[in-house]
Structures are given as structure tokens and as C-alpha cells.
């Protein structure tokens, strides 16, 4: 791969995003956590909202989890919001060495190790923050980078170690060519996101197609990497939505661990449990909701009943599944 060609391409096409105009480690970490499972346009909205309210780790640490989750609502993958709150409190723990701040500049290994010691920070996020905030040569590996490596080498099933080695080698070549680590990592990721896409690959616009073995292979670039078999488990649940005379539902806060931890919603139980049979007794089936998670399919029967006192869900952090369940129940009540 020609580092200069990729860096030149990136300089011409790089998207103007606010987290690319700062070296604040907290702002960059927040963007990386959001963008792991959220598209850029939506991530920008949530990044601005969260950074306005929590401009420092200390500001988030001082808030309770419910406020953080309420601001996170709609961004999806709610465990990220919980872990971010845990991270902020860990950074601000008076017995910890952080002093309320993310790591000071140091060696690449030291900064990456320090970041990975924090809740919810894995190798990708640590490398991204180290390279973008501190310009340290820590090569990132995400789905986009993995795809570029696989196609450049025409390797259908590269191991994690092989992908990291390739990314590290590219980083060394880029730094030797005078390219900043922050620029290089973002260039490779953007190449995978906008040109070397999973489908609809744009080889004609690729600045490094000359070195791409996937393009010249008989199978073509989209054959790489080989798709992984995906196993989706189906769970059947019963959601109980009891409404008061004003149409407000009875809501409970979910436990601090497990699916949708800390969020609010109607009681929801396994459809095959003894509790499900008892909860369905005397209530009416309002409808069904199918909800897809990354490796799980949730099929939910929504039943409705009556309660003396409900709560307005707008003021509480809820999951997108709970929002859909409540909509089915309220539509049934209004019919």
C-alpha cells in the first residue's frame, strides 16, 4: 500500500466532523464510543448533546446514571452509556491516579495500557484515542480496517493477529513517510467506510487499488473477507403494560446488570416462565413486537391491563424495544 497516496486522498475527501477539530481526549473518546454502533449523522447529534452537558469526565461523574441514560436514549446499545458513566467515575475516583483527567501524553504502550484499564475501553478505542488525541502510532483495527486488510491481501479469513500485524506495519510505513498517526488511522477507516465498502465497492475511486490483490483476483474484492456464519437466537417474551385512567403505563426500572440495564419499561418476562402465565391472566393481548439485536431476535407478546397509577415515559430513559411495546399498548387502548 502507498501511504502517500492514501493520505493525499484523505486530505482531499475527509469529512469535516467536530471531533476531528479537537485534541481533547474526552471529546474524542466520547465520539469513538458513540460511533462504534451508531451512524455518523446520529452520532453527531448525540455527541453534541452529551458533550454540552458533560464537557469533562468530572461533569459526567457528578451526574446520576439515570440522567446519562436519558441523554443517551435513542443512540442504542445502552451498555455503552452505562460503561461511559462508570469510566467517568473511575477517572474521578480520588483513590485513582487519574485526577479527573484521561491519560497525559506518554509512550504509546503506556497510554494505550492506561486507557484499556478503564471500564468499557478495548483495544480499538484505546488505539483510536491514543492516535487521534496524542498522535501516538497506535494502529486501530475495526471492521473497516479489517476489510481493507483482507482485500489488499486477498485473504478470506485473516486472523485477528494477522490483521493487527498488517495494520501495525502500515502505521510504521506511514510514520516513516511523515504522515501523522491521527491522519493515517482515520484515512484507513474512511477508506473502508466510503470506498472499500462491504457491498457496492468503489474500486475506481480507491487511491490504493494498485496494491489490492482482491481487486485483481478472480473472485473480485467483495469476496473478501469471507462472510462469517451468523447464529441468531430467538427469545419469546411477554410484556405487561398496565395503564391508568389517563393512559399512563406502569413502569419499572430494570436491574443494574443484564439487558437494558438501568433503563425503564413495562415488566417483561420469558414467555415460557410460570410468571408469564400468571401475568397474562386477566389481561388482553394488544399485539406483537419483533425486535432484532446483534445476535438475538426478540418476539414479544404485548398484554394490557389496568393500574391505579402510571408514569409518563417521556421523562424516563427507555429502550427502543420498550418504546415500541408501549406504542402497541397505547394504540390498542385508543382503538
Residue ranges of each PLM-predicted region?
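Intrinsically disordered, low-complexity, charged terminal extensions of DNA damage-control enzymes
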Residues: 1-21, 190-335
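Catalytic cores of DNA base-excision repair glycosylases
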Residues: 5-204, 208-220
Amino acid at each position: 500500500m502507498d501511504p502517500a497516496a492514501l493520505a493525499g486522498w484523505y486530505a482531499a475527501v475527509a469529512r469535516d466532523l467536530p471531533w476531528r477539530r479537537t485534541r481533547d481526549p474526552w471529546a474524542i473518546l466520547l465520539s469513538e464510543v458513540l460511533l462504534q454502533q451508531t451512524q455518523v449523522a446520529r452520532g453527531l447529534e448525540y455527541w453534541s448533546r452529551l458533550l454540552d452537558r458533560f464537557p469533562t469526565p468530572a461533569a459526567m461523574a457528578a451526574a446520576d446514571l439515570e440522567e446519562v441514560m436519558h441523554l443517551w436514549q435513542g443512540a442504542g446499545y445502552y451498555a455503552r452509556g452505562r460503561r461511559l458513566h462508570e469510566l467517568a467515575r473511575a477517572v474521578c475516583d480520588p483513590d485513582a491516579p487519574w485526577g479527573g483527567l484521561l491519560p497525559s501524553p506518554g509512550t504509546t504502550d503506556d497510554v494505550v495500557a492506561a486507557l484499556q484499564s478503564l471500564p468499557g475501553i478495548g483495544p480499538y478505542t484505546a488505539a483510536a484515542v491514543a492516535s487521534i488525541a496524542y498522535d501516538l502510532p497506535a494502529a486501530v483495527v475495526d471492521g473497516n480496517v479489517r476489510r481493507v486488510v483482507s482485500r489488499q491481501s486477498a485473504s478470506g479469513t485473516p486472523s485477528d493477529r494477522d490483521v493487527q500485524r498488517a495494520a501495525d506495519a502500515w502505521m510504521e510505513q506511514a510514520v516513516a513517510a511523515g504522515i501523522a498517526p491521527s491522519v493515517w488511522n482515520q484515512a484507513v477507516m474512511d477508506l473502508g467506510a466510503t470506498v472499500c465498502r462491504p457491498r457496492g465497492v468503489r474500486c475506481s475511486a480507491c487511491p490504493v487499488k494498485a496494491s489490492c490483490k482482491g481487486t485483481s483476483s478472480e473472485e473480485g474484492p467483495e469476496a473478501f473477507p469471507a462472510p462469517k456464519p451468523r447464529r441468531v437466537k430467538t427469545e419469546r417474551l411477554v410484556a405487561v403494560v398496565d395503564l391508568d385512567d389517563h393512559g399512563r403505563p406502569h413502569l419499572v426500572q430494570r436491574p443494574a446488570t443484564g439487558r437494558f440495564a438501568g433503563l425503564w419499561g413495562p415488566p417483561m418476562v420469558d414467555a415460557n416462565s410460570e410468571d408469564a402465565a400468571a401475568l397474562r391472566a386477566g389481561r388482553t393481548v394488544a399485539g406483537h413486537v419483533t425486535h432484532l439485536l446483534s445476535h438475538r431476535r426478540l418476539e414479544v407478546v404485548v398484554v394490557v391491563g389496568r393500574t391505579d397509577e402510571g408514569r409518563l415515559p417521556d421523562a424516563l430513559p427507555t429502550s427502543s424495544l420498550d418504546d415500541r411495546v408501549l406504542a402497541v399498548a397505547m394504540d390498542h387502548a385508543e382503538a
